Amino acid sequence: MISPIEPGQEWTVESFTPKDAQGVADLFLGIYGREYPVRIYVEPDLLIEENRSGRVISSVAKTAKGDIVGHNALFNSSPCKKVFESGAGLVHADYRGGHGIFTQMATHGLTKGRERSDVEQVFGEPVCNHPFTQKLSRNLKFVTRAIEINLMPAATYAKEASATGRVTTLLDFITLKSSPRTVHVPKAYESIFPIFYENMDDERQFVLSAKPLSSQRSTTLDTQVFDFAQVARVAVKALSLDFPTVMQAEEDRLLKQGVRVVQVWLSSGDPCVGEAVDSLRSSGYFFGGVLPRWFDSDGILMEKLVDEPVWEEINLYFERSQTLMALIRKDWEAVRGLNPKDKGRAGQ
């Protein structure tokens, strides 16, 4: 049984220690229930091991009694091991609303990231069913670079009843350690790439992607499927002339598993990326944005959906995300025109 926490206590934000693990698990279980899909945060021994190994860097809000009233973490979820996500954040219901806990935990995580040699870029996924995390991200100097349409099912937010349909998220980035890169720009997106890279906090050199796909190597994919969300993320590790065939076979496999959102990550460090983008667009994928340092080189997000987005229910608080969304929606509509049979949607 989860012990109640006395409201109104003083608290501080600190680095996670093993004795905090049960309190973090209780917090997640109390808010999200026992079906929470990421087991690291509801199984104390796993959380201790992940923090010990450095794969997770947890920050906790703790009272003088030792009660855990908040948690946020940095963790690696991109192909590049030097890019960490800021997430797994939550605050006890009695400690929400103007206390600043979430902001302090996220700030604490960035401070710890700057102290470590293995954390060079951090990103977050502010949800678009309410403005809080969008405001937090902006206040911490993150910049929106991509938007994940229909990422999370409404069931994820059922306990707090904050969504009626699938929830879209932003992808916001901040550079902690400079690492200049060359970006190969697909011809299809030559006019809009500069907008997605506006206010970039690191150096980028842009060249047009003009090299054709080659048969000298084979296409290599690394796919993650998130069954609870019905989402698949396909990291393209190597591009070859067989990419259209390999990708179509992978998509067919994923749709048979019940996947409703397919994301494809391409490296814009590859001079052939433009032809891969053209292939994906001809198969119903639309542009989602850019991903700094995603493969160590930058990445490009392409998306395909089974369900048509309810665009009007995507709540965007800032002008920048509204501008990017308009460009993304325009490409979604253009791709529908290229694929009249399925209207730009996977599996329909």
Question: Which stretches of residues belong to each language-model region?
Answer:
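A conserved beta-strand-loop-helix scaffold within acyl/acetyltransferase catalytic domains
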Residues: 15-93, 126-127, 222-230, 237-242, ...
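Non-catalytic interaction/regulatory modules that flank or connect domains
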Residues: 197-289, 293
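Conserved catalytic-core motifs of GNAT/GCN5-like acyltransferases
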Residues: 123-125, 141-161, 286-297
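Conserved N-terminal entry element of GNAT/NAT acetyltransferase domains
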Residues: 1-19
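Conserved acetyl-CoA-binding loop-helix of GNAT-fold acetyltransferases
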Residues: 91, 97-113, 122-124, 243-251
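Conserved active-site alpha-helix within GNAT-family acetyltransferase domains
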Residues: 128-146, 156, 271-287
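Short hydrophobic/aromatic beta-strand element in the GNAT-like acyltransferase core
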Residues: 56-60, 71, 169, 277, ...
